[in-house]
Each structure stands twice: as structure tokens, then as C-alpha cells.
């Protein structure tokens, strides 16, 4: 699959759903069109017919069809809604194997440290690598398999002891062996290990605030500030996640489509045997093929990243003709062109330190240097991003507000429209509400202590406002992402408000954004993991402990690595170029963004050069109001429900290229791949879509990310000096990789 990675950036894992990428929410049928399930009874539909009763397996030996699918007809069902996915795509099988084990905790801790350390290291590398998703699942799989095979197994020793006549409780030494290595590496242990690592990595984005403060501002930075802030942000997001479970986790439409490849990969690795399972064989065939192929576009033959026939046909063009052709059809690197019909077969400086003294605006210096200028395309992208945020808020309330209320009422009555959650209610103790409320209170107090005691230029009242903003936006962002698998970038809203409320304080702006936007981001990620726990039948209280543990562990690990790198390479990181081993480009960009928003009252205020940017919020909301009125009078157009149109996403993508897309060459390939899988396979080959689509996708992701991870150490400069591949026509280092003409 094509990888929309930034230039010289390798993305190993899933994209952050609310960091400038795009996320959304599915249409919800009317209440009488939904199947509502209790945990142990079926109900009669509104038309008087008896709907199918959902049978949850109550023991490992329960061999009902529900352990896998709801009968043979599932193979031909077209997966459209969340109910379709719950009923026909995701099996109900629950082996009731233990989820929390000693080896699982040890491996989860090790994998969490591995992911947190590398994520933090790559933040300061010329080549960025984000380790997550299927890649982590595969590492955990082989690590668990090695543990189970390499150490004495308690189940085997106990079996031998009983064969020799042993009865009752086994001896202490067998119990110890069983505690360390109970038996085969199981699905739930594997999932808990992967989810813990994901929770630990959530802290990496928050730590960017402290790195920027330490590098660019003369403000003290203590371990207390970093660790407590990271824990406060992570836990507050988790507390919000727990409170909005009825709409973001338990709701049948909250599918989290982008996590299904991970779920199907986990289930395939543990539930299917290679010799007897055609889907699992195809998983490894796909993995092997992609592993062998990815070396070409990633290193040897970069032209495969952007195959542009128009560029090939116009290689010798010059002057204005070359410029026009490249601007239209080029797209292999940043700012080259729009990348039309291009196929991807791969997966000036502003004197910031002078203008801001001690993290606060120096108006005398500002008068001397003047205001920074934004490019027209970037200003347009900011406007569209804000319009999408306004549309998101309006769309959620005008189109799905009633659904929110019904979801909480159903949860209070013990009625569930997702059979997976109905099964969880029947067989496992739910995490009490007060646990999550306690997490919210504790994290709030921790953050307040930091704001009051530490010099971070963020007033206590602004801290409270930032959390209230996170509480308001988090449910909207999460419900959108959970239902569509992509969503709306909300990070600009927090930065804009901080800039208007805290003018001239870039450090305070960064902390404000961390306690609002990063809380939102963490809430989305943690809700995604909670839903994955329901799909894999992991007890809710185990999920609670797992995610709390990963969040706290990640705070300490990320701080330790960050402070070591910054103190050891300060001059290189502050320097605009760095070297082949270390680069402060990410921190510099982050700090520049904060600086821009710290001047919001000058740039975006009334009479400012970019005053239309914040007005975009109102325009986006107004468009959704018009859409809602249109739906009222014109509910359908030729059989298509007009309410299906999701304006927030439409608006977001209208400004996508100048704000999000570093390589436009991948867009056309993504459209083709999406049309093939989501339209053709989903509608005309539903069995192939159900059995292979997500599994093969997981294999492609895992293989390509494994190759990129190896290359980052071997040749891309992550583990030493970079070693570029020799120049040839398929690796046009001196020009554009897609061979578009270079205008003079």
C-alpha cells in the first residue's frame, strides 16, 4: 500500500488520527432500524418479526456458529454498517484464556520501553520512524513464541506429573514454572502486550513540548515538570475515554475500521494453523512478497514511489512548459506538484529567540523584525482546517446528537446494540464509572500542581480552559474517527485559542495545546484500544490496568531518553541543519508553529493579514446548518440519503494537500486501492473482502514497516551515517524522483 510519508520520513505504523490527518463518523440509522440486544435475550423488531438471537459463547467448548460467524450466509453479506461488521466480520469466539500473566507483563514492559525509546530517539533523527500497529503485533508475536518455546512450560510439567499419578495441587516448583511460562503464547496475552506498548508511546507527542522549551527558551525544566505533565495528559485523556464509553466503545457503529487489520492479524496468528488455513497462508504469502518488494521503492528504485507517465513523456521539456507539467503531474517530493494521475507503487528563518525573550514576546524586537508571513496555500489550508472543525462540531450535534442521548440511556438500562459488548457484559466485570472519574480527578490535580509550582508561563485559569476544550472536543473527534476510520484535525483550534488568550507566550501556547489537543489525541487512541479489547474479549478491568500502566511507564521512559539526547546534542539540535545522526528539524518546526500562534492577535485578529483563518470555524458550522436544512426538505436523491454526506470530511480534504500531503503522488494510488477494496470487493466479492481484505492489509503493513525499520538503521542514518544508493535513472537524486522536467 502506498505510504504518504513526508520527505525523508519513514512511517512505521498507523497515523495519529487527530494530528493533522483526517478522521470521521458513520451514519446512524433511526432507532427503530437498529437491532438492540440485551446480554441474554433477543427482542422483537418493530415490524413484529423475531430478530436473530445473539448467542455468546460461554465456555471454550461452546461450538456454536457464533464463535466464528453467524452461519454460512455471512460469506455473502455485504459489510456496510457497524452492525454488519459486528455480526458478520468480527467473530464472537472467546477461549476464556488468561489475559494478564507474568510473561505478558514482562514482555509488555520490554516492548513498551522499546517503542517509547525508539519513538523518542527518532524524533531527533533526520529520518523519522514511528513504530506501532502491525509491526508491534508481529514483534510481540515472535517474542511471546520464543518465551513459550525457550523456557520450561508449566502445563507440560504438570501433565507429566499427573501421568505419574499426581493428584490435587501440583508441587510448588511446578506452580513456579507455570507462573513463569504457563503454556502456549495466547491471543489475549499477545493483545495486552501490544496495547500496553501503544499506551506507552502516547507520551512521545507530549514530550515535544519540553524538548522545545529546553532547546529554544531560557526557562528551567525539571524532571517533576516533565513526568507529572506527561502522566497528567495521558491519564486525563484516559479518564475522558472511560466516561464516553457508551458512544465511543460500546456503540455498534463505533467500529474503528482502521484497527481491524490489527484485530484480524491477531486472530489469524492464534486461531488458524498454517497448513489448514488458506487465509493465514495468504497472510504469510503477502508478508513475504511485500518484504521482498519493499526494498525496491524504499531504497533501490525510488521512481516506483511516483510512476508518472506524463512526466516520462515530457522529460526533455524546458522553461515554462516544464514548470507547468511538473506543477500538475509531479508529486514525488515536497512542493513539487499535484501528482495528478501519478501512481505510487509503494507503500526562510525567523529570529525566534530574539523576538521571544524568556518565552514571552519582546514587542521592541517584534517592531524591529516585523511579523512573520505565511504562504498563501498554507493560510488557505489553515482556513479550511478551521472550517472543518466548525463543521465537525455542528455535524455531531445536528446529525448525531439524538444518537448520543440514546446511547447513554441504553447503557443505563443495560441494553446494547453491539453483540460483542453484550458478550462482555455477560462474562466479565465492567470497569466501574468511578474508577475513570477518580483518574480524571487525580490527573487534574497533578496538572494543577505543575501549573502552579513550575514556571511554564501558563496561568491556572488557562490550564482549566484547555482541559474544558479537550473535554468538549474529545467525544466529537472520537465518535467521528470510530465510525469512519479517519477524521478531522483539531489541533489548530487549541493553538488558535491559546494564541488569542495568551498573546506573546509561545511556551504557554505549547502547554495549553498539550493539555487540550494531546488529551483529545490520547482519548481517541485509548478508546480505539478499548474497542479492540472488546473484539478480542479482553476483560475490561485488565484493559484498565494495562492502559494505566503503559501510560505511566511511558512518561518516565520518554523523559529519560529525551533529556539524555537534548543534553548530549544541544548544539546540533539547535542548529538548523544538524548532521547525519541528529536533527532538530522536528523541534524547530514545532516551535515555529507555536511562535506563529503566539502572535495570533497580530496575525489572525481583527484587521490582521490572516483574519479570515479563525472565521473559518463559523463558516464551516454554517455550511452544516444549511446541509441539515437541506436534508429536512430533501431526504433522498435517487435513492441516496442526503444525510450520508459528511461535510466535515469534505471541507478537510479541500485543504488537505497544502497542509497534510508532503507527497501528492500517493493520492491517485489511494483512490484506486480504495475503489477496488471498498467498492468492488466489498460489494461484488464480499467473501473475499471479509476473509482476506483486512488480513492481507495487515501483512502488507507489517512487511513494509519491517523493511523500513531495517533500512532506517542500515542505510537511512538512524543508526549512524547514511548510505545513499548510487544514482541511476530509477534513483534520480539530482532531480525529481518521478523524472518530471526541472525548469530553469
PLM regions: where:
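Alpha-helical multipass membrane-protein architecture
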Residues: 2-744
Amino acid at each position: 500500500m502506498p505510504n504518504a510519508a513526508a520527505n525523508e520520513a519513514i512511517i512505521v505504523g498507523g497515523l495519529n488520527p487527530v494530528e493533522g490527518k483526517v478522521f470521521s463518523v458513520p451514519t446512524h440509522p433511526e432507532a427503530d432500524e437498529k437491532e438492540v440486544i440485551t446480554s441474554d435475550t433477543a427482542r422483537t423488531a418493530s415490524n413484529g418479526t423475531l430478530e436473530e438471537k445473539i448467542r455468546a459463547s460461554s465456555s471454550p467448548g461452546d461450538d456454536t456458529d457464533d464463535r466464528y460467524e453467524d452461519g454460512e450466509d455471512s460469506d455473502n453479506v455485504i459489510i456496510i454498517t457497524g452492525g454488519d461488521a459486528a455480526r458478520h466480520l468480527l467473530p464472537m469466539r472467546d477461549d476464556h484464556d488468561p489475559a494478564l500473566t507474568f510473561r505478558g507483563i514482562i514482555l509488555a514492559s520490554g516492548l513498551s520501553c522499546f517503542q517509547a525509546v525508539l519513538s523518542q530517539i527518532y524524533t531527533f533523527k533526520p529520518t523519522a520512524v514511528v513504530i506501532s500497529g502491525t509491526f508491534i503485533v508481529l514483534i510481540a508475536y515472535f517474542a511471546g513464541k520464543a518465551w513459550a518455546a525457550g523456557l520450561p512450560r508449566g502445563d507440560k510439567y504438570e501433565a507429566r506429573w499427573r501421568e505419574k499419578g499426581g493428584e490435587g495441587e501440583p508441587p510448588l516448583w511446578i506452580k513456579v514454572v507455570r507462573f513463569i511460562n504457563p503454556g502456549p503464547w495466547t491471543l489475549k496475552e499477545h493483545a495486552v502486550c501490544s496495547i500496553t506498548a501503544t499506551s506507552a508511546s502516547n507520551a512521545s507527542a507530549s514530550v515535544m513540548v519540553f524538548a522545545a522549551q529546553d532547546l529554544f527558551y531560557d526557562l528551567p525544566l525539571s524532571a517533576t515538570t516533565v513526568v507529572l505533565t506527561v502522566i497528567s495528559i495521558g491519564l486525563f485523556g484516559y479518564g475522558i475515554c472511560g466516561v464516553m464509553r457508551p458512544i465511543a466503545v460500546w456503540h455498534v457503529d463505533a467500529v474503528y475500521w482502521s484497527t481491524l487489520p490489527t484485530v484480524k492479524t491477531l486472530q489469524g496468528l492464534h486461531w488458524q494453523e498454517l497448513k489448514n488455513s488458506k487465509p493465514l497462508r495468504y497472510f504469510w504469502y503477502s508478508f513475504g512478497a511485500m518484504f521482498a518488494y519493499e526494498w525496491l521503492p524504499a531504497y533501490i528504485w525510488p521512481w516506483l514511489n511516483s510512476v508518472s507517465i506524463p512526466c516520462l513523456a515530457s522529460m526533455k521539456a524546458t522553461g515554462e512548459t516544464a514548470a507547468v507539467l511538473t506543477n500538475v503531474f509531479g508529486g514525488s517530493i515536497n512542493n513539487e506538484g499535484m501528482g495528478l494521475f501519478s501512481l505510487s507503487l509503494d507503500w526562510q528563518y525567523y529570529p525566534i529567540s530574539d523576538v521571544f525573550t524568556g518565552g514571552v514576546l519582546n514587542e521592541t524586537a517584534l517592531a524591529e523584525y516585523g511579523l512573520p508571513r505565511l504562504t498563501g496555500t498554507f493560510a488557505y489550508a489553515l482556513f479550511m482546517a478551521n472550517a472543518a472543525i466548525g463543521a465537525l462540531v455542528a455535524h455531531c450535534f445536528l446529525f448525531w446528537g439524538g444518537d448520543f442521548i440514546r446511547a447513554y440511556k441504553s447503557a443505563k438500562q443495560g441494553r446494547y446494540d453491539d453483540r460483542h459488548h453484550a458478550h462482555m457484559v455477560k462474562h466479565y466485570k465492567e470497569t466501574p464509572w468511578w474508577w475513570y472519574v477518580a483518574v480524571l480527578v487525580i490527573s487534574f490535580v497533578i496538572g494543577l500542581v505543575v501549573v502552579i509550582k513550575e514556571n511554564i508561563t501558563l496561568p491556572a485559569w488557562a490550564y482549566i480552559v484547555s482541559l474544558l476544550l479537550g473535554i468538549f472536543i474529545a467525544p466529537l473527534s472520537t465518535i467521528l474517527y470510530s465510525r469512519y476510520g479517519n477524521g478531522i484535525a483539531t489541533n489548530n483550534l487549541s493553538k488558535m485559542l491559546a494564541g488569542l488568550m495568551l498573546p506573546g507566550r509561545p511556551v504557554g501556547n505549547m502547554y495549553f495545546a498539550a493539555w487540550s489537543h494531546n488529551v483529545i489525541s490520547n482519548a481517541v487512541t485509548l478508546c480505539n484500544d478499548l474497542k479492540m479489547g472488546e473484539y478480542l474479549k479482553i476483560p475490561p478491568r485488565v484493559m484498565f490496568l494495562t492502559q494505566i500502566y503503559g501510560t505511566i511507564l511511558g512518561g518516565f521512559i520518554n523523559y529519560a531518553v529525551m533529556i539524555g539526547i537534548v543534553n548530549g546534542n544541544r548544539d546540533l539540535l539547535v542548529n538548523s541543519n544538524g548532521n547525519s545522526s541528529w536533527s532538530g528539524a522536528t523541534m524547530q518546526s514545532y516551535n515555529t508553529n507555536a511562535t506563529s500562534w503566539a502572535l495570533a492577535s497580530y496575525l489572525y485578529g481583527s484587521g490582521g493579514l490572516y483574519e479570515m483563518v479563525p472565521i473559518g470555524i463559523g463558516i464551516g458550522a454554517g455550511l452544516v446548518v444549511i446541509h441539515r436544512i437541506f436534508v429536512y426538505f430533501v431526504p433522498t436523491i435517487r435513492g441516496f440519503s442526503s444525510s450520508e454526506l459528511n461535510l466535515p470530511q469534505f471541507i478537510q480534504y479541500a485543504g488537505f494537500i497544502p497542509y497534510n500531503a508532503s507527497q501528492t503522488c500517493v493520492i491517485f494510488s489511494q483512490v484506486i486501492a480504495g475503489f477496488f477494496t471498498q467498492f468492488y470487493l466489498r460489494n461484488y466479492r464480499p467473501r473475499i473482502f471479509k476473509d482476506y481484505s483486512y488480513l492481507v492489509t495487515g501483512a502488507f503493513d507489517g512487511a513494509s514497516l519491517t523493511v523500513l525499520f531495517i533500512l532506517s538503521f542500515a542505510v537511512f542514518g538512524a543508526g549512524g551515517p547514511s548510505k545513499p544508493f548510487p544514482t541511476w535513472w530509477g534513483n534520480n537524486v539530482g532531480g525529481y524522483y518521478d523524472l518530471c522536467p526541472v525548469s530553469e
